[in-house]
């Protein structure tokens, strides 16, 4: 049997979930020789000390401990675990998951180079029922979880069915992840999974969901907090509101990156490759910066008459990190020191002076007056713009309502976006290995 590098990230208030996950690893893995990597991003419950006691059971347990006053965040720490993995095959498990019997044997049976293998989740009824998972309530408290009952349920419900949905837990060859640069640290609280899915598929990796490997998932423990579902918990509900704000900012960054929120259509053959067309916008008569922000995200470049808009937009981009920093308890001072660790939006790369616009060098140009454009065009037109361009066969000049656009070259540029680079971490800011 090949050895797997199981990668688990954890943070504050999760020790009981971690203990349960390790119980399931001990009970349900067929071998204890696999490498287990745990990234402790923050710790307020003695998780590090408890994990040290597990080295006798799991001789290849490797603990990565963040000692900074800020969290790396899961986009970054997943990348770091995969970088540190000793084996060709990596398998990511969230700390609030529980694995079925012979999980390692099953994923090894199905994974191969060029395959992104997703296990099937079993979740409590906190989210809508869906065809991509089992909904079954084994409880919300990890200290009261009946591992034997879950293991029996999983044995009874395993099947050889395969579908194509994408989510954690997942297993793949480490090289496939490294080849596209891993998670983009531009996304700090959500959307990082959708982004990496698009890039993996563009790099000819196929997503396969096996219904033979099952994992219970308490859901949203890391992103929203262990008590996010408790309507009577005021602190948890306040945190949930901040997470929702952070989600909105992440969606804006995703739209800037890919033109709209999308995954590529899921067909019987798997996810289709996404397409992306470079669209430059000449936005005239900008008086309302909030309105401008709601429109500018749909274009890869924006040209404006007033250069001051560039600085104003940079301030808006910088403000977007406030919600994530609040959730991660990162002060403004700490963010100034450590923000270099993450990809960030730079307004001057996207927003430029109208005097610099050479339309002959642009693939596609759209022109409109911001004051005369209604917000309804965002949902009726702009979120579909990439698809509209894709379905437009001829080049030339066209009009749609207040928009005038010219297609000089219809070239799919998605291939240039599949590989990303994240900033290097300074040596003095690296985690320690134990």
For each of these PLM feature ranges, what is it?
Residues 150-172:
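A recurrent flexible, glycine/aromatic-enriched loop bordering the glycosyltransferase active site
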Residues 67-85:
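Glycine-rich, basic loop-to-helix element that forms the pyrophosphate-binding segment
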Residues 23-33, 294-300:
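Short, acidic, metal-binding catalytic loop of nucleotide-sugar glycosyltransferases
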Residues 98, 102-140:
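Conserved donor NDP-sugar-binding/catalytic core segment of glycosyltransferases
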Residues 209-238:
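Active-site donor/metal-binding and catalytic loop motifs
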Residues 164-181, 187-214:
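A short, conserved alpha-helix in the catalytic core of glycosyltransferases
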Residues 87-100, 363-370:
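Short beta-strand-to-loop acidic/aromatic patch adjacent to the donor-nucleotide binding site
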Residues 39-49, 306-311:
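A conserved acidic beta->alpha catalytic loop
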């Amino acid at each position: 049997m090949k050895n797997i590098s199981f990668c688990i990230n954890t943070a504050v208030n999760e020790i009981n979930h971690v203990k349960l996950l390790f119980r399931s690893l001990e009970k349900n893995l067929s071998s204890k020789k696999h490498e287990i990597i745990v990234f402790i991003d923050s710790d307020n419950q003695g998780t590090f000390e408890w994990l040290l006691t597990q080295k006798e059971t799991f001789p290849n347990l490797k603990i990565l401990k963040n000692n900074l006053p800020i969290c790396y965040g899961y986009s970054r720490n997943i990348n770091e675990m995969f970088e540190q993995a000793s084996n060709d095959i990596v398998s990511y498990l969230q700390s609030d998951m529980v694995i079925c019997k012979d999980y390692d044997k099953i994923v090894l049976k199905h994974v191969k180079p060029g395959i992104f293998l997703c296990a099937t989740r079993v979740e409590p009824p906190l989210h809508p029922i869906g065809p991509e998972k089992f909904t079954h309530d084994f409880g919300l408290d990890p200290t009261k979880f009946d591992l034997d009952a879950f293991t029996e349920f999983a044995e009874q419900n395993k099947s050889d069915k395969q579908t194509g949905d994408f989510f954690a837990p997942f297993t793949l060859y480490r090289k496939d992840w490294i080849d596209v640069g891993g998670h983009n640290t531009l996304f700090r609280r959500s959307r990082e999974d959708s982004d990496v899915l698009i890039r993996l598929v563009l790099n000819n990796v196929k997503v396969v969901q096996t219904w033979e490997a099952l994992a219970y998932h308490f859901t949203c423990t890391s992103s929203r907090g262990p008590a996010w579902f408790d309507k009577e918990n005021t602190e948890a509900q306040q945190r949930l509101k901040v997470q929702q704000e952070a989600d909105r900012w992440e969606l804006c960054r995703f739209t800037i990156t890919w033109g709209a929120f999308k995954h590529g259509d899921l067909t019987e053959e798997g996810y289709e490759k996404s397409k992306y067309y470079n669209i430059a916008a000449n936005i005239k008569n900008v008086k309302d910066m909030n309105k401008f922000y709601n429109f500018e995200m749909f274009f890869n470049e924006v040209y404006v008459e007033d250069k001051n808009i560039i600085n104003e937009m940079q301030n808006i981009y910088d403000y977007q990190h406030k919600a994530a920093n609040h959730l991660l308890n990162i002060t403004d001072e700490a963010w100034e020191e450590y923000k270099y660790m993450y990809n960030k939006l730079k307004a001057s790369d996207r927003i430029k002076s109208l005097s610099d616009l050479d339309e002959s060098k642009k693939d596609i140009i759209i022109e409109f007056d911001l004051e005369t454009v209604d917000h309804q065009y965002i949902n009726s037109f702009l979120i579909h713009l990439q698809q509209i361009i894709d379905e437009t066969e001829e080049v030339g000049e066209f009009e749609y309502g207040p928009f005038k656009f010219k297609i000089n070259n219809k070239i799919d540029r998605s291939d240039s976006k599949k590989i990303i680079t994240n900033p290097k971490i300074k040596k003095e800011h690296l985690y320690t290995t134990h």
